[in-house]
Amino acid sequence: MIAKIGRYHLCEEFSHMRLFHEMFRTFRLDNVQWVPLGKWMGRMYRLFPRFPEAFMAPPAFVTELMGLTVYQHIDGALDKILADEPKARDRVRELLREIMTDELAHVGQRRNFMGPIGLGAARLFVEPMYRAFFRDLPETRLLFDLDHMVRDGKTFDYSAIAPEMIEKSWVPSYCKTLPRSEDGSRFDNLRRG
């Protein structure tokens, strides 16, 4: 069952390329050339399939979390970057949120199959994996606050995700936010396994 879910998510990852291409077309960048991963990330992704699931699960979880973090930061910057292009901004946000909805499910699926040891390992991997990945992207310094992204990865919380995205995606039941009390506060921030 886990392998089938993984294959389904891999198909979604490939469909994201179509959505990214549509974003580029929104900016009339029809001739974008996709480049391979940098040296370190290329090596890491070649090694991933060779490890047993128990060893692969924490770094796989972190890569999904990293994607979601990047998309959240891009989404947060769209209003400023595309302030004078509301149609383009709205179209890019629509496409980006489709990807984010899938990524949210991928994070949930990966989280669902990790026990406390795997989750602890994933927490240790967040900073080095984020830094290694973004070191290979020269645009990082111009587009992102890497320290902020690392912090967001380490403190990821489903309650920070837009409710309409959670409604469309899949989130483990033990990670869903609890209802608010009469005074508006949450009984508990997040249920965790």
What are these regions (language model features)?
Residues M1-G193:
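Non-heme di-metal
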